[in-house]
Amino acid sequence: MLNVLLCVDGSRESNKAVKNFVQMVAALREMPQVHLLTVHRPVPGIGGMSRALSKGSLHKYYKEETDSALKSAQALLRKARIDCVVHAEVGDIASTIVRLAGKQHCDMIYMGTRGMGAVSGLVMGSTATKVLHLASVPVVLVH
């Protein structure tokens, strides 16, 4: 069974990746194991701000961000009758994606790119570029 890490952030690009993924799954003979991941950058410790936030308010913030990032992707997967295991992490986005792919023994990483403008090498997304360099499994980037 194919084991896939599907990475989302709630953006239009990540929703396009989920829609593309759903189309790919329809062509498969066997339903893959799907790990749906969203990663948040840590709240910076600017001027003692992180110390001023309680663990409860920080947890609430990350939960709200997670719910927002996952909402559309979960709806698209549910509509396509694709089950998934949800993961929400805090940390460096690219290294967290690669770490979780390894931990879950994923066969591939599936994710969207950022806008591809005139400076596509820079804008493709430092996250997408870093994942490509760090990953030991195939990475599917959907534009």
Language-model-detected regions and their locations in the chain:
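Small/aliphatic-rich secondary-structure junction motif
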Residues: 2-53, 82
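Gly/Ser-rich helix-loop-strand patches that form or flank binding pockets
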Residues: 3, 99-143
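Phosphate- and divalent-cation-binding pockets in alpha/beta enzyme and binding domains
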Residues: 16, 96, 118
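Class I S-adenosyl-L-methionine
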Residues: 22, 71-78
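General small-molecule cofactor/ligand-binding pocket signal
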Residues: 35-37, 85-89, 140
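A short acidic, glycine-rich active-site loop
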Residues: 54-68
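Structural beta-alpha unit
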Residues: 75-109
